[in-house]
Amino acid sequence: MKKLFFSFVFMLLPLMAMAQQSVPAFKFGYFSYDKVLHAMADYATATRSYNDLKAKYDAETKRSVEDFNSRYEDFLDVQRKLEPSILRKRQAELEELMDRNIAFRKESERLLKKAEEDIYAPVHAKLNNAVRQMGKESGYAFILNADNNSVPFVNTAMGEDVTEALIAALK
């Protein structure tokens, strides 16, 4: 039994040695997501679109604040001359206007956040698809996002910076 076992092990040794020699080289890529994203023409277009929308909301917010301020100043000018019932009515109107302004501001922030996600989603999808495609074509095991000091060390013998290649591919 021992002879059979040892002969089997000796037959497997050359196979195991060949298997270790044929291990493919492990390689990966890394890039700066922000640098590539900001270099994309689609990102500039999306940013302009978002900024236009934000400017419209900001203008409406400014208009409503100015309207409230002018009404409040008018109220302060005539406050001492008003009857108590009219005074309470005007105060209630101002409070309601202020509450509506606060509600509008919160709603506009929510809508702007959603619009930002919707506007930039196709840009992020395009970049992610390009990264995926480059990884497949170049045979990378994975591609890392090196922003925010998330990858403090990269061995350049094993990893390759694909930032410029991605920028070129997305133009």
Placement of each model-derived feature along the sequence:
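Amphipathic, charged alpha-helical segments and their helix-to-coil junctions
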Residues: Q20-K171
